[in-house]
Amino acid sequence: MMANNSTSFFVNLAGNVSQQAARFSNSIANMANKNVSSLNKVSRAISAVSKGFNGLGNITIPIIGVGAAAGATMVGKSMLRTAADFEMAKIRMKQTFGEQGEAADAWLKKFATDTPMAFADTQDAMMRLKTAGIDPMNGSLQALVDYNAKVGGDKANLDGYISAISKGFIKGKLSMEEINPLLERNVKVFEILAKETGGKYTADQMQKMLQEGKLGRKAIHALLRGMGRDAQGAAKEQMKTWDGLVSNLEDTWTSMQARFMEHGAFDALKKELGDFVEWLNEKIDDGTLDDFPKTVSDTLIEALKNLKEMAKDVKPVLESIGSVMSWVSEKAGGYGNLAKFMGALYLGNKVLRNDKVQTLGGWGWSGAKWGYNKIFNRKKGGAGGLADGVAGALGATVGVTPVYVTNFPMGFGGGGGGGYGYDVIEDGRDKDKKTQKKNKPPRPKRGRGSVRSPVAAVAASAAAVPKVAAPVTTASSGVARSVGNGVKSLGRGASKAVPYLGTGLAVAEGVTVLMDDTTNTKEKSEAIGSIAGATAGAIVGQALIPIPVVGAAVGSYLGGWLGEWLGSEVGEYLSDPEPIKNELNGTINIAVKASDQLIATATQAKIQTNQQRDSLETAVQMGTLGMGGMW
């Protein structure tokens, strides 16, 4: 089924139409000239990194079996952090509960899964009650959690309950100092205590006993029992709500991660780290590393200087790319779609690297491959234009049909004659370039006042782009080699892949930031910079620090930090764009490339706006635009 796509164009054509048109075209051409050089450098670098990008996924996918981004995030951050937290939890529970430590740890995991409480919050509550002398596993914590759910309280409200009860138990009796926080949190203390006496005392009598200091620890136990009876099952009911289900899912996932790491992976990583620390201590003791700290320090300082020098050249490139990224994001419908495109790019890379050509929906496959080739300049000869690359990539990924605005006849404003514009739409099918060139009619000569095609300007400037500097080429090939080594190391032990997870984690978190609608341009730019910095830093660190694991790990995090700073600087530049004033006057001719099996139609309509003097008409032509005419 064909997708129903739409594209909006805003063109300032007020005043002298010919002059405004020329100015508009020149602005687009200038932007293209600045950006195409940077994008072609990045394009060639990406081509070299393609194997590395593919290999990075091969590291993460076998470990988790979900995908590159999810694998890097879970292994690099979530799973290791969870395993470390559970390890510390066992130690703390054993120290607090003594011989009951293992039983308390098992009870903790089950209780957190069965209630809206998170693991860390449950552990904290258990330890606070136990420290005060109250056994949390005898129903006390369940009573507090149920009552908190009954009144719709949050974690802070529950903390207030625990604090008041714990203080009273430590003192040995209740006073208004402990009762007031409970009353403020909707606990009917005296009514509950009176009910627990079986009607022997009234609420007023219980309040009088409090004033006389007669409500001791037995009264506190009675209060906890009464709170549990009064709110029995409230937490279980809360688990059926959306927030409760989300909380349960988080706890279940955390438990799953802990179990993954319990099957040897975490121990293997700890052993590798322990071996390195032991080796380092031996070298320090025997004097081998007397000069090592200075060597490492000098190396890192030199690397930082090199990265900062590189940053001076990278910053304007990032600014240019960032401007284009913002434009692409706007056309793609937001950074969320752009992040989906990045994910699809990885999958496309995996598929296109296979020797066997697969048929995936006829034209959809060829269109996807065409868009992919446009980005990576896979066509023989010169680099593809910026507009073609962007349109092809987005068209292949999210179904956007490439649309170009030609605006004016060739002779408009005193220029040459005949026909509409230049060849602004390129056929997606691969043809022999010599045949194409031979069949093309001669290009019309430009008049003095003619409008230059923005796409033609892009192609012209692309041909003049200088070669990528040697350091960039070296860095790109270094990524492929480093990641390739990471793939091989996976078979020898999961821990040896850790240095490469810095880059994978930066990619995964970057996609997460781009997909978050609440993040601003500066934060998105920081994410993009962090990805680039982590990759470059890992290469520099691996090359300069003679210890493989330490070199890549230190370099990736150093580079990630520097890249994030660079991205922040670029974000400041991008966060306050100048507003564009749009006035709708004139005639716009729109040429839309028709895909296979699409019926071409031609319409002309006058657009009415809220401005009285607007006179905007559109002429839409469907088909392939030729050199000397419409088709």
UniProtKB/Swiss-Prot annotation:
Membrane topology: Multi-pass membrane protein
Designated name of the protein: Mu-like prophage FluMu protein gp42
Keywords on record: Cell membrane, Membrane, Transmembrane, Transmembrane helix
Compartment(s): Cell membrane
Stretch list, region Disordered: 425-453
Database matches in PANTHER family: MU-LIKE PROPHAGE FLUMU PROTEIN GP42
Family affiliation: To phage Mu protein gp42.
Composition-biased stretches (Basic residues): 434-449
Parts of the chain that traverse the membrane: 56-76, 385-405, 455-475, 495-515, 543-563
Keyword Plastid among record annotations: no
Gene Ontology annotations for the cellular component aspect, listed alphabetically: plasma membrane
